[in-house]
Structures are given as C-alpha cells and as structure tokens.
Amino acid sequence: MKSKFIVPVLKPESYLRKILSTPQGILYIGKYPIKDLEAHILVGDIVSNTLRGNIKIIDYKTRRHINIKPIINEPLTNLVNPRGTMSLMSRTIAKAKNYRTIIVKGEEDLVTLAYALENEETSIAYGQPDIGVVIIKSNRLKALRILKTFKPDIVVYNKV
C-alpha cells in the first residue's frame, strides 16, 4: 500500500504556468547532450548528467516517464514536490544548503524558485525537450516577483 503525504505547497495561477513553460532565458539549440555549458543550478536528469553545476535537481525521469540513473557523487536528499507546485519543503532544503543533489518525487521544475530565493544572483539550466538547453539568470527579486503570485494549497500526494 502506498503512503499518503499531505504536502503544503504554493501553486502558480494557470496563466503563469503557460508563461513559465516557454523558454525564459537563452536557448542553446542542439541535440542532447549539449556540453561545455555550466550553471549554478541544473534541473533535470539529462542536463544534470551533461553540464557542470553546483546543485542538481533530478527525478530519475525524462519527459515524465523514461527512467534514467544520473551519476551522483555528492550528498543528496529526497524531496516530495507534487506536479505543478513548489512544496514548502523545497524551501527548507534550499535554505539548509547541505545538499548538492535533490531527488524529487513528483516534478522538479518549480523547485528552482526555492533555490533562486537563496542567491542574490544565480544561473539555472534546464532542458527544453527536442530543442536544447535554456540558461536563465535569476536573482532573489525575480523569484519573489514570481512567487508572490502563487497561492497556498494542500496536496494529498500518494505516488511515493
């Protein structure tokens, strides 16, 4: 039997999800793996395996269904983050600054906002499926502007 988790989250409005699904930074077009790029925060398994970065946010999946095992050589932790949300636990883990690899049960995309809040200036790299890699420059103020539009919610999560 699967365990159920009650997860406090922040959810973006639907209009914002559409905006955030388009590339928000510089798009490097090319076949995977694109190498010779680096960013402070890497989001996604393929990007985390091929680029250089300080923090890796992964979920052992590509396009939500293909399981892959990235190379992990640093301290890691697990995080429950339901799809389309930023769990409050992601903020706690980002603030702790003890982990270089975060394995997400759910969806990793919005977890990056928690890390952007912790840095005056940061760079984030993520994959744009079938196109390439996006690198965006972010900072605490940009993250706060986005997060202030999110609404608090509770999600019952039973996919762990």
UniProtKB/Swiss-Prot annotation:
MF (Gene Ontology): GTP binding; kinase activity
Keyword annotations of the record: Coenzyme A biosynthesis, GTP-binding, Kinase, Nucleotide-binding, Transferase
Catalytic reaction list: 3'-dephospho-CoA + GTP = GDP + CoA + H(+)
Protein EC: 2.7.1.237
One Pfam family matching this protein: DUF359
Annotated positions binding GTP: 45-47, 59, 61, 108, 130
Any GO BP annotation: coenzyme A biosynthetic process
Class of this enzyme: transferase
Pathway(s) of this molecule: Cofactor biosynthesis; coenzyme A biosynthesis
Function recorded in the entry: Catalyzes the GTP-dependent phosphorylation of the 3'-hydroxyl group of dephosphocoenzyme A to form coenzyme A (CoA).
Similarity-based family: Belongs to the GTP-dependent DPCK family.
Protein name: GTP-dependent dephospho-CoA kinase
Species per Swiss-Prot/TrEMBL record: Staphylothermus marinus (strain ATCC 43588 / DSM 3639 / JCM 9404 / F1)
